[in-house]
C-alpha cells in the first residue's frame, strides 16, 4: 500500500461485514494450544503482523503446526508442557505486546536462555511490573538495555508461590502470569496492587484457560489462586471470536453516516469487553440491535458523553473520532494506559484531532473533545499505530476528504481494513 491514502467524502455508510479474528484471542489461543496435551484446530485465526510474530516464535521453540493457505485455520500439535529452547535463542516480536508479555512468562518456566526483543517502540513499552512478579516466583530475568523495558533475557526458574503484581498499567502482565501459573511447580497465589485496568481482558484470559482445561480461583479480580503442576488440555476445535475492537470502526461509521451496518462474528454472548463499545454508541444516541452472532447499528443524532473508558481502552479511541460528529463535548476518562500502547495514544490522538479542527484538552489520563462546526481536510500522522489509521478513516464520513499517512500500519491487526471499509462506503 502507498505511503499515504486519501479517502474521499462518503455520503452513506451501510452494509454487512464478517469480522476477522480477535488479535487478543488469537495469540492467547496459539500459546495455550502450543503448551496443551493433544492437537488443537484453531478456526478464524487472525492473519496479521502480531499473530505472525507469535507463530514465528512458537516455530523457533519447536512447536509444530499446519497453517491453511488463507492463514485463518491452524492445527497445532501441543507439547503437553512448557515451551523450551534448544540452546540460546533470540526471538524478535516486533511491537506485539500480546506476544512479548505472555511469552516472557511462559519462557520463565523453561531452563534455557531466551532473549525477547522487538522494534524500537517495544523497547519503550514497560515490562517491569511483570518482571518483578516473575522474580518473586523465582524467575531469573535480566534487562539487556534499559531497566524496566525489553529486551530481556530469561533464564527460567519460575516456580509459583506468593506473588503481587501492579495492575494499574497493563492487564497483559496479569494475563501472562495467569497463563504460565498452571505449569509452575507450586500453587501460585496472585494479589493485585493498585487498580486493575482493562478488566474485561482478564475475563477473556480466564475463559480461554477454562476452555483449555484449567480453572482459576478468582476473588473479585483482587486475588487469584492457580494450582500448580497442571497441563493444558487441547479442546480439539477452538473458534476465535471476531475482533470486537475492529467492529468499533464499522459500528461507529453507521452511527455517523448510516444506514445500518451489521457486523457478524461477535454478539451478545461475546467474551470480549470491547463489545460494550456498542453500549457507548447507544448512550450517544445511536440505535443498536444485538443478536447471538451479530451487532447492528443504525444512525441517529449523536450527542457528546462524559464516561470512564478504562474497560474498553482500544475501542474508546474510536469514540474520540466519533465525537467529531456529536453535538456538544465528549470527555473520555481513566485512559492513562493509552500512553503505553503502540504509541502515546493520548498525545497522538489530541494532536491529530486538532488538525481536523477540534478543540482538545489533553489531561494525564483523560481527553476532552469539542467538535468543530465543519471538519477540516488534513493529513493524519499514524505513528505506526494501526488504531490511529482506522479511527481517522471515519473523518471521510463528513463532507471532507482525509489523508491517512502510512495506511499499511493496519497490518498489525487488520491488513484488509481499508478494502473492507471502502466496501461499505457510498460516495458523495
From Swiss-Prot:
InterPro entries: Enolpyruvate_Tfrase_dom, Enolpyruvate_Tfrase_sf, EPSP_synthase, EPSP_synthase_CS, RNA3'P_cycl/enolpyr_Trfase_a/b. The active site is at 314 (proton acceptor). Pathway: Metabolic intermediate biosynthesis; chorismate biosynthesis; chorismate from D-erythrose 4-phosphate and phosphoenolpyruvate: step 6/7. SUPFAM superfamilies: EPT/RTPC-like (SSF55205). One of its GO terms (molecular function) is 3-phosphoshikimate 1-carboxyvinyltransferase activity. Gene3D superfamilies: Enolpyruvate transferase domain (3.65.10.10). It is found in: Cytoplasm. It comes from the Bacteria. GO terms for cellular component: cytoplasm. The keyword Cytoplasm applies. Phosphoenolpyruvate binds at residues 23, 97, 125, 172, 345, 387, 412. Its main location: cytoplasm. It catalyses: 3-phosphoshikimate + phosphoenolpyruvate = 5-O-(1-carboxyvinyl)-3-phosphoshikimate + phosphate. It is an enzyme of class 2 (transferase). GO terms for biological process: amino acid biosynthetic process; aromatic amino acid family biosynthetic process; chorismate biosynthetic process. Keywords: Amino-acid biosynthesis, Aromatic amino acid biosynthesis, Cytoplasm, Transferase. 3-phosphoshikimate binds at residues 23-24, 28, 170-172, 198, 314, 337, 341. Catalyzes the transfer of the enolpyruvyl moiety of phosphoenolpyruvate (PEP) to the 5-hydroxyl of shikimate-3-phosphate (S3P) to produce enolpyruvyl shikimate-3-phosphate and inorganic phosphate. Monomer. Belongs to the EPSP synthase family. This is 3-phosphoshikimate 1-carboxyvinyltransferase. It comes from Edwardsiella ictaluri (strain 93-146). The lineage of its organism: Bacteria, Pseudomonadati, Pseudomonadota, Gammaproteobacteria, Enterobacterales.
Amino acid at each position: 500500500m502507498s505511503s499515504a491514502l486519501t479517502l474521499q467524502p462518503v455520503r452513506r455508510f451501510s452494509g454487512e461485514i464478517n469480522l476477522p479474528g480477535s488479535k487478543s484471542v488469537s495469540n492467547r489461543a496459539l500459546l495455550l494450544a502450543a503448551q496443551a496435551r493433544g492437537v488443537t484446530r484453531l478456526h478464524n485465526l487472525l492473519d496479521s503482523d502480531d499473530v505472525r510474530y507469535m507463530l514465528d516464535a512458537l516455530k523457533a521453540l519447536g512447536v509444530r503446526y499446519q497453517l491453511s493457505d488463507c492463514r485463518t485455520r491452524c492445527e497445532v500439535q501441543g507439547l503437553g508442557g512448557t515451551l523450551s529452547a534448544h540452546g540460546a535463542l533470540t526471538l524478535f516480536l516486533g511491537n506485539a505486546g500480546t506476544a512479548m508479555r505472555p511469552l516472557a512468562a511462559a519462557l520463565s518456566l523453561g531452563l534455557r536462555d531466551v532473549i525477547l526483543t522487538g522494534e524500537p517502540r517495544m523497547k519503550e513499552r514497560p515490562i517491569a511490573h511483570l518482571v518483578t512478579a516473575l522474580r518473586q516466583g523465582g524467575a531469573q530475568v535480566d534487562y539487556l538495555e534499559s531497566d524496566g523495558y525489553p529486551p530481556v533475557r530469561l533464564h527460567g526458574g519460575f516456580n509459583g508461590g506468593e506473588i503481587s503484581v501492579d495492575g494499574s498499567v497493563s492487564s497483559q502482565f496479569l494475563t501472562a502470569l495467569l497463563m504460565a501459573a498452571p505449569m509452575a511447580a507450586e500453587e501460585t497465589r496472585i494479589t493485585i496492587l493498585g487498580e486493575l485496568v482493562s478488566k474485561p481482558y482478564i475475563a477473556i484470559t480466564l475463559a480461554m484457560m477454562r476452555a483449555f482445561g484449567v480453572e482459576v480461583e478468582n476473588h473479585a479480580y483482587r486475588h487469584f489462586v492457580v494450582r500448580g503442576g497442571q497441563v493444558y488440555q487441547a479442546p480439539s476445535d477452538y473458534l476465535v471470536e471476531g475482533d470486537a475492537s475492529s467492529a468499533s470502526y464499522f459500528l461507529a461509521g453507521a452511527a455517523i453516516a448510516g444506514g445500518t451496518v451489521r457486523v457478524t462474528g461477535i454478539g451478545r454472548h461475546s467474551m470480549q469487553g470491547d463489545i460494550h463499545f456498542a453500549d457507548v454508541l447507544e448512550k450517544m444516541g445511536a440505535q443498536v440491535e444485538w443478536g447471538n452472532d451479530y451487532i447492528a447499528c443504525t444512525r441517529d443524532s449523536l450527542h457528546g458523553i462524559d464516561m470512564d473508558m478504562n474497560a474498553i481502552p482500544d475501542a474508546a479511541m474510536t469514540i474520540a473520532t466519533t465525537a467529531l460528529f456529536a453535538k456538544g463535548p465528549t470527555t473520555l476518562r481513566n485512559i492513562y494506559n493509552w500512553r503505553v500502547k503502540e504509541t502515546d495514544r493520548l498525545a497522538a490522538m489530541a494532536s491529530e484531532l486538532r488538525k481536523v479542527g477540534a478543540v482538545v484538552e489533553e489531561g494525564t489520563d483523560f481527553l476532552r473533545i469539542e467538535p468543530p462546526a465543519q471538519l477540516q481536510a488534513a493529513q493524519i500522522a499514524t505513528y505506526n499505530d494501526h488504531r490511529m489509521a482506522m479511527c481517522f478513516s471515519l473523518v471521510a464520513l463528513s463532507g471532507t476528504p482525509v489523508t491517512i499517512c502510512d495506511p499499511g500500519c493496519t497490518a498489525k491487526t487488520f491488513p484488509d481494513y481499508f478494502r473492507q471499509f471502502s466496501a461499505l462506503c457510498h460516495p458523495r
